[in-house]
Amino acid sequence: MALTPLSDALERILSDVEATLDCDTVALEAASGRYCAATINATLSVPPADNSAMDGYAVASRDVPGALTISQRVPAGHAPVPLEAGTAARIFTGAEIPAGADAIILQEDAGAGEGQVTLPAAQPGQHIRRRGSDIQPGDELVAAGHRLTPQDIGLLASVGLDPVPVFRPLSVAVLTTGDELREPGSGDLDPGQIFNSNRLSLAAQVRALGMKVIDCGNLPDDPDQIGDALERAAAAADCIVTAGGVSVGEEDHVKSQIEQRGALDLWKLAIKPGKPLAFGHVAGTPIFGLPGNPVSAFITFALVATPWLIKRQGGQPSPMQRFPVRAAFSITRPGTREEFLRVRLTGSGETLRASLTGSQSSGVMTSLSEAGGLAVIAPGTTVAEGDWVEVMPLSAL
């Protein structure tokens, strides 16, 4: 079977995905991390009126320099009265500008006396935040499909919006397979066993996307049990993610059970780690069959499953961020697969360097936990120390 480039696999997978557009409304305070279900435009100006950017004195610029009587005091949240000619208003940051004033003079530039203040010259408009200078009616604040951030919550609050229209979170069933797997916290390992890291790692990746996890646990290497579990997952979830059982071993039963109970494309991706990938459906529910090695499972989920899930959720998959970094390692990769090396990032600016996190084996989880990014190495490439390499930050995956 020919190797499939990652870009080709993504194009095929993403071309047919349809968004699940079930909508809900939630309180603004609970909306962070949710995917917005409608484009939101402003209906008012921010700020709603001219206000002071500083503590000081509101004046008509034509009246200064000179000594002026203080005619009123304007704290934030209180409506001013029109400024009397030839006077100054004591004003505080955020307070509305009195009609008749066109400048703010900083309090540290003023010489205060009993009921009067001596003020320097001022330019019209200085230290004034104009009405609508941040947001004007009709401005687009959030696009449909955008995943709401804490910054967005503040933005929407500033225009008084509450509640917010959002998409229902996808439900993603996560299951692993393998007689050798034991759950963390369940006791000591017996001979031949290892702890199951994939189930919890994949569930965490799903939750990080703002989606719900249906935990289907770990299945033994028994085809009937695996098949029955897949059908139960298909009935309960919007998508299924499995780890293990999609290679060509005698005990790799996930592949055969998907084929029996649905449809399957089995690809050999031209990436390392993460060559085997299954994508298809069970009883109409899409399924990703990821490799069993922990690093491979993590990376294929991040590179392949994540953009599909975001699009299915109604979101907007972003191009994978890459930035150039000087290599603090040397390596030759004569093969035919694009490689994603786990790298530690040190320094900043022109001194930023990427160094390998040790062994790059697909079973070495420390290579991921110690990494700040993935260095993308094209097939047939030799990298010398000091060469530029492209790095994908793990925080963006």
List the predicted regions and their residue ranges.
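Flexible glycine/proline-rich
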Residues: D24-E29, I135, E259-L397
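Solvent-exposed alpha-helices and their adjacent loops that cap or buttress functional pockets
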Residues: D50-S52, S61-D63, P80-E84, I97-A99, ...
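Phosphate-binding glycine-rich loops and their immediate beta-loop-alpha structural context
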Residues: H127-T242
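Short Gly/Thr/Asp-enriched flexible loops that form oxyanion-binding sites at enzyme active sites
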Residues: G249-R261
